[in-house]
């Protein structure tokens, strides 16, 4: 305990540094006598501070509290309205402010002009192009940096260099911001016209990005990269990130492979000491030179020089610097364009008649055949999911926007909302619900648009289609994805794989007679030429499928799906441009359909197959693998002779020529040693990931609270760190302090302590030690966890009112009646709860809940309520186990080579000792027999929590549960009476525990938990047959050992002599574990 609390205390003295400021620590203890002293201590502090007396003597008098109790929070108040930022900033604003080049970007509004030059009046102003969309302010960010600088001003040696570098960069930011004054944010953390009119429009988002970059500077190289990006991104708001990251697609082709990992038959990574030389034709170097020249033209100096220096010997040892540049380029922030430009981008492509019709035909046929292949089993067997597709669609309907705001009546309450789920309920109540009619999206009813912003790319538009489109596509797409799940070609969907498996797949076939072709097809996916052949291929496939069945319901499902494709072939979109709404005929494919991901993958696979079939007319090769991953596709081709420069050049030109014949504007490259796609890149036989998650700017605003965003910030920091981009941890912790503090009044604020923010309760935000998820087992930890659990989820009056209305009740019972054959309270209640949870995305409800949550939290942070909760958490289980473990020192040799060079040392060390894993551990119960049985007869998908609850019921009840979901009685009886059922109990418990312990998140997802090297450090004498207990003991031991190794860089072995008498007690407890959702778990989930 301590680092966070220490920094917190220092931070508060830094912020409130005037005479009138007071900090009062609040302590608690699970020991009732000490707890009494804590309460006395607190009231005396309050008394003294009211009288303006010093608190020093109280601290002495209550030494026992300060030493033995746990810090709960710090209450801080100050009568100074703190414009302290401005005052402090002047001290750092000693440099020359940046001047924006006002002609740096093609689009006028992307130039960093004064706001009043871009938007002459308040009415025209919008912050949508520069909104940081995060619930923390520029002034907080400036404070956090200045706090760090003040704290480290006297550092020595290497640390002093870091201080100097950051100070230098901050001087640029401070001088520029100070020139115009710090923009003040409003209550919603937005920057209004009055504040911004005399300041550069992009000042805030630029300053946020710059702060994020300068707080990630450690080495001299970091400093050079950051300086260049900070200075240039002030002017260039459009192409900088793209320019800096472009060379990577070529750099990966330049590094020889000298030893790599490949996927073996068991789908594990296995070291191979093969040597593959990088064969690079001159043309490639010319293209690279052109990229570097473009960088120089844009004013970059140091970055292109670093790349040129690396090119001298192209070594993998120095490649991490290239990876670093690639990652850093994304931290200049999001490129946010006007919707009109984003839409026109796809419509600008000139359509030519001069295309290869033969290739288009082949492309369409391949799409058609793939659609048929994916669905024919389901259609021939009249799959129940295709029969009840409407119900399945309704059950998984999201609460996203339906594209228009409507007035809805729920009982006596009238509300305005755009949410799909509410529209469906309302339509059903008013007889307007007609899933059999897919509304047109033509000129009479154009599609409203959403947006997707991403660093280094143009803004993309998203269709917000009426909910009928989702219902029509849901079931069919689910079937397509199920097929993709066991098809290796679909890297993104392939069963439980992770990116390491795809990495081993590529390196597996690289040799001196093979080349790999990799293409980024994101331009093609959203190009107009794609739309006709794409939709037609799908339609033709659906027509063939419709002739394979006589089931009217299945035919109807396919017919509706086909209708969505026909409608979308004639689509118009509505784009607000100033005050007018423009209607534009939009020919391209945009995301927003349920089928987007699946259909794009099918089309990309068809595209690369079409291209390869043309290339095969000219060359003789074997296609070893073809893979599609999102917007990228790649294939490894094996020739019967050794690859030469000339061959690489010829194949490369032919491939590009082939794409050109389809008028596909794509970036196609050929290499012998590496690839670069959006998700990952392989160079020198090693795998790299782009560490490009922005911390202080967000893509869009949602309805998450500050706490949620603090957890997301931390989670993003962890992901970046695993991928090789490290931001100063103290800075991150300072941001967490700022974002989790709660204002009580204008001058009174409460700051939660480390214990509150790191205990796994509903309020957890971060881990006290990076990469280690701790489950507190001390009395104080369990005590505070119980206290937080008593703060059960908050009620919302609006939600209750809606849920009590006839409209809502009828909807829920309609779903239940369609789904269930007989009464089943578990499922009915589950559906009602799910539907009620969907209401949370309606702002007034989430606001109401948040207020309740905050006030409960305020009470709790001032005095924890003792509450004897009968709920059992994973902490209780570990608390029971812990005493029986004995630790001794051990030794594990490093025996595996590095293959992910960007990992932090402590994580790398563990992988090198125990090995890595290429699969996700199943943590949703979907592999259990009961789950398979349910999905065989019903469209209902129980969650792991529900399965865990059901499987522990009496056999009679399980049987009733199954029968009510439409499972034939004979199957239900067989299941309950079989061995499979007892295996399931174990299997589901296992999944549930894995789920609770976040085993597929953070760095745990990289470790091989079944490593024999790890097993041999654990000794647990075998007693009695309770596999569940054996499992939890082993898993606990593994986590303890791994956590110890992450922290200390050395190994321990564990011996456990667990008494047989305790085992049955523990086993019973294990069936009552409550799962805890927190901002922290949501952030993990959000990473997914």
From Swiss-Prot:
Main location per the UniProt record: virion
UniProt-annotated location(s): Virion
EC number: 2.7.7.48
PROSITE patterns the record matches: RDRP_DSRNA_REO
Domain RdRp catalytic as annotated: residue spans: 501-687
Catalytic reaction list: RNA(n) + a ribonucleoside 5'-triphosphate = RNA(n+1) + diphosphate
Molecular-function annotations in GO: nucleotide binding; RNA binding; RNA-directed RNA polymerase activity
Gene3D superfamilies reported for this sequence: 1.10.357.80, 1.20.120.1390, 3.30.230.140, 3.30.70.2480, Viral RNA-directed RNA polymerase, 4-helical domain
Enzyme kind, highest EC tier: transferase
GO CC term, one of those recorded: virion component
Pfam families: RdRP_4 (PF02123), Rotavirus_VP1 (PF12289)
Requisite cofactors: Mg(2+)
Biological process according to GO: DNA-templated transcription; viral genome replication
Keywords: Magnesium, Nucleotide-binding, Nucleotidyltransferase, RNA-binding, RNA-directed RNA polymerase, Transferase, Viral RNA replication, Virion
Function summary: RNA-directed RNA polymerase that is involved in both transcription and genome replication. Together with VP3 capping enzyme, forms an enzyme complex positioned near the channels situated at each of the five-fold vertices of the core. Following infection, the outermost layer of the virus is lost, leaving a double-layered particle (DLP) made up of the core and VP6 shell. VP1 then catalyzes the transcription of fully conservative plus-strand genomic RNAs that are extruded through the DLP's channels into the cytoplasm where they function as mRNAs for translation of viral proteins.
Subunit description: Interacts with VP3 (Potential). Interacts with VP2; this interaction activates VP1. Interacts with NSP5; this interaction is probably necessary for the formation of functional virus factories. Interacts with NSP2; this interaction is weak.
Family affiliation: Belongs to the reoviridae RNA-directed RNA polymerase family.
Protein name: RNA-directed RNA polymerase
Natural source organism: Rotavirus A (isolate RVA/Monkey/United States/TUCH/2003/G3P[24]) (RV-A)
Upper classification of the organism: Viruses, Riboviria, Orthornavirae, Duplornaviricota, Resentoviricetes
């Amino acid at each position: 305990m301590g680092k966070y609390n220490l920094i917190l205390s220092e931070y508060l003295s830094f912020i409130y540094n005037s005479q009138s400021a007071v900090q009062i620590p609040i302590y608690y203890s699970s020991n009732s006598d000490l707890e009494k002293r804590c309460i006395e201590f607190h009231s005396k502090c309050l008394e003294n501070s009211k009288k303006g007396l010093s608190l020093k003597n109280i601290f002495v008098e209550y030494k026992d509290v300060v030493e033995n109790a746990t810090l709960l929070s710090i209450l801080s108040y100050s009568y100074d309205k703190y414009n302290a930022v401005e005052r402090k900033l002047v001290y750092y604003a000693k440099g020359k402010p940046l001047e924006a080049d006002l002609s740096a970007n093609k689009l006028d509004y992307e130039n960093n002009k004064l706001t009043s030059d871009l938007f002459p009046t308040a009415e025209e102003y919008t912050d949508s192009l520069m909104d940081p969309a995060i619930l923390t302010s520029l002034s907080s960010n400036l404070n956090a940096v200045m706090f760090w600088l003040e704290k480290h001003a006297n550092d020595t040696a290497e640390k002093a260099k870091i201080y100097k570098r950051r100070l230098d960069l901050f001087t640029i930011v401070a001088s520029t911001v100070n020139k115009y004054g710090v923009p003040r944010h409003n209550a919603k953390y937005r920057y209004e016209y009055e504040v911004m009119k005399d300041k550069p429009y992009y000042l805030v988002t630029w300053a946020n990005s710059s702060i994020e970059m300068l707080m990630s500077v450690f080495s001299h190289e970091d400093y050079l990269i950051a300086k260049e990006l900070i200075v240039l991104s002030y002017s260039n708001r459009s192409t900088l990130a793209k320019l800096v990251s472009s060379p990577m697609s070529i750099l990966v082709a330049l590094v020889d492979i000298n030893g790599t990992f490949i996927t073996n038959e068991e789908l594990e990574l296995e070291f191979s000491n093969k040597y593959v030389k990088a064969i690079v034709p001159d043309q490639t170097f010319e293209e690279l030179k052109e990229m570097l020249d473009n960088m120089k033209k844009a004013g970059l100096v140091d970055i292109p020089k670093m790349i040129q220096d690396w090119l001298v010997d192209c070594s993998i040892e120095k490649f991490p610097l290239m990876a670093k540049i690639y990652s850093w380029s994304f931290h200049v922030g999001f490129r946010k364009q006007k919707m009109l430009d984003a839409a026109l981008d796809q419509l600008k492509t000139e359509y030519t008649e001069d295309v290869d019709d033969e290739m288009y035909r082949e492309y369409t046929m391949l799409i058609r055949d793939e659609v048929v292949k994916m669905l024919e089993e389901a259609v021939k067997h009249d799959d129940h999911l295709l029969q009840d597709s409407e119900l399945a669609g309704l059950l998984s309907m999201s609460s996203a926007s339906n594209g228009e705001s409507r007035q809805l009546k729920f009982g006596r309450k009238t509300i305005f909302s755009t949410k799909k789920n509410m529209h469906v309920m309302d339509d059903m109540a008013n007889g307007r619900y007609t899933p059999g009619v897919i509304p047109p999206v033509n000129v009479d009813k154009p599609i409203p648009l959403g947006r997707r912003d991403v660093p280094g790319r143009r803004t993309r538009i998203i269709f917000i289609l009426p909910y009928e489109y989702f219902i029509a596509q849901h079931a069919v797409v689910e079937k397509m994805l199920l097929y993709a799940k066991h098809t290796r070609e679909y890297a993104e969907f392939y069963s439980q794989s992770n990116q390491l498996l795809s990495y081993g797949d590529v390196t597996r076939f690289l040799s001196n007679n093979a080349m790999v072709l990799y293409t980024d097809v994101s331009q093609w996916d959203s190009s107009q030429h794609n739309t006709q052949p794409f939709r037609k291929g799908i339609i033709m496939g659906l027509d063939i499928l419709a002739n394979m069945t006589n089931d009217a319901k299945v035919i109807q499902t396919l017919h509706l799906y086909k209708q969505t494709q026909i409608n979308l072939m004639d689509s118009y979109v509505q784009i607000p441009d100033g005050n007018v709404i423009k209607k534009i005929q939009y020919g391209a494919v945009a995301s927003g359909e349920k089928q987007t991901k699946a259909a794009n993958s099918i089309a990309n696979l068809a595209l690369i197959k079409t291209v390869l079939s043309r290339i095969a007319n000219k060359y003789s090769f074997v296609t070893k693998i073809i893979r599609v991953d999102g917007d990228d596709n790649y294939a490894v081709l094996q020739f019967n002779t050794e690859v030469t420069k000339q061959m690489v050049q010829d194949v490369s030109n032919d491939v590009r020529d082939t794409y050109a014949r389809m008028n596909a504007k794509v970036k196609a490259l050929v290499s012998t040693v590496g690839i670069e796609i959006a998700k990952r890149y392989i160079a020198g036989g090693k795998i790299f990931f782009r560490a490009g998650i922005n911390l202080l700017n967000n893509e869009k605003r949602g309805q998450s609270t500050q706490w949620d965003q603090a957890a997301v910030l931390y989670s993003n920091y962890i992901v970046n760190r695993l991928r090789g981009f490290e931001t100063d941890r103290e800075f991150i912790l300072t941001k967490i302090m700022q974002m989790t503090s709660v204002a009580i009044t204008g001058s009174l604020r409460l700051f939660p302590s480390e214990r509150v923010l790191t205990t796994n309760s509903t309020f957890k935000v971060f881990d006290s030690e990076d990469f280690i998820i701790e489950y507190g087992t001390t009395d104080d930890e369990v005590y505070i966890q119980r206290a937080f659990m008593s703060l059960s989820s908050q009620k919302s009056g609006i939600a209750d009112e809606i849920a009590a209305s006839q409209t809502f009740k009828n909807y829920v019972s309609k779903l239940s009646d369609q789904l269930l054959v007989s009464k089943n309270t578990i499922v009915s209640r589950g559906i009602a709860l799910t539907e009620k949870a969907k209401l949370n995305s309606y702002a007034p409800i989430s606001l109401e809940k948040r207020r309740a949550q905050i006030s409960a939290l305020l009470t709790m942070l001032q005095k924890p309520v003792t509450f004897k909760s009968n709920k059992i958490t994973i902490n209780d289980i570990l608390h029971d186990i812990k005493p029986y473990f004995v630790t001794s020192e051990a030794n594990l040799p490093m025996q595996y080579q590095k293959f992910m060079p960007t990992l932090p040392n402590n994580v790398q060390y563990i992988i090198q000792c125990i090995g890595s894993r290429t699969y996700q551990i199943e943590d949703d119960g979907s592999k259990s027999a009961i789950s398979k049985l349910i999905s065989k007869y019903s469209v209902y998908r129980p969650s792991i929590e529900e399965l865990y609850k059901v499987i522990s019921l009496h056999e009679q009840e399980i049987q009733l549960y199954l029968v009510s979901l439409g499972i034939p009685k004979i199957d239900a009886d067989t299941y309950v009476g079989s061995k499979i059922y007892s295996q399931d109990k174990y299997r589901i418990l296992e999944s549930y525990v894995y789920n609770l312990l976040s085993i597929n998140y953070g760095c745990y997802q990289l470790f091989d938990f079944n490593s024999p090297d790890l097993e041999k450090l654990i000794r647990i004498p075998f007693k009695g047959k309770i596999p569940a207990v054996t499992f939890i003991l082993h898993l606990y031991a593994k986590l303890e050992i791994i956590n110890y190794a992450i922290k200390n860089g050395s190994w321990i072995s564990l011996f456990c002599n667990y008494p047989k008498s305790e085992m049955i007690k523990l086993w019973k407890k294990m069936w009552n574990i409550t799962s805890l959702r927190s901002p922290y778990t949501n952030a993990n989930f959000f990473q997914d």
